[in-house]
């Protein structure tokens, strides 16, 4: 044998004791943190925030500041009282505050912002264990609660501003409210024709209408939504399913009875559909984990929203639909879970019987 083959193997030197860390999966890290994810979502919200300020002026600034500040305060106080590590720096409370503000009218008083922030942070988030453990979208829960408990302030609109301040209270409903009141009447066709006119749709698309801060400019929301998809922060199946199903369902209803509801473009550009589709229903914590589940989730949100808009008591039902479907996310995940290769009901039953025997 040659000298090389006769050489003894080198001694293996183990690392010092305590230098190796054992941890559970996943071991592959994308490099994203909670703070960076929240920051990216906030950046994507900037077109919507900017549009709301341009449309409603100082009133929008105050509502945004109130909700953001109150959410931060409640987050800080909860962690302080329970002696938990502070989470105010991860920007999740700020994001909740901004989305909540976009669900409120520009005329919302400070106490309404305070109540909504308490519901969003304490009731809908922290009581369930904090970020990552809340089953419902905090902003959607807060909006639903405020609509039920404080319908007056929640439906008091301000006209789009003429200067930097807007103080004129609307004496007529939003486009969705007009459509709901006209539905089924003799003048429904004329009212719907006006709402669906090029000028009417452009007003809704650009934001020159009354309503909540985040439901007036579909263009601004669309720009922010594209940013979310580019950053890969959301599953595109959810907004695609919501918008597509809404257009299909309202087209069918409008075709069957033109006096019951306006056409699909009106429904997409009006109300909180776009905001809910891109920034609320796509919440990572409260949406399904599979692509098929996300699509089903979006379809059901759209159907519930359309049913409430056409036959319900409220002009818009996006937040109601999101909260209802949040409760069904565990069921959707269970039904859409990918079975391992070779799985069958027989093998699963046999395995369960074997497990019971071992116990």
Could you say what each language-model-derived stretch is?
Residues 1-72, 79, 356-359:
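N-terminal signal-anchor module of multipass membrane proteins
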Residues 40-48, 63-75, 92-97, 101, ...:
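Alpha-helical transmembrane segments in multi-pass membrane proteins
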Residues 57-70, 107-116, 204, 208-218, ...:
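Structural signature of hydrophobic alpha-helical transmembrane segments
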Residues 135-140, 239, 264-271, 294, ...:
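Loop-to-transmembrane alpha-helix initiation sites
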Residues 133, 138-222:
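Long hydrophobic alpha-helical segments that form multi-pass transmembrane helix bundles
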Residues 239-241, 248-291:
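A beta-strand-loop signature enriched in Asp, Gly, Thr, and Trp
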Residues 92-166:
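A generic, well-ordered mixed alpha/beta core segment in the N-terminal half of proteins
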Residues 73-84, 121-132, 223-232, 278-287:
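C-terminal ends of transmembrane helices
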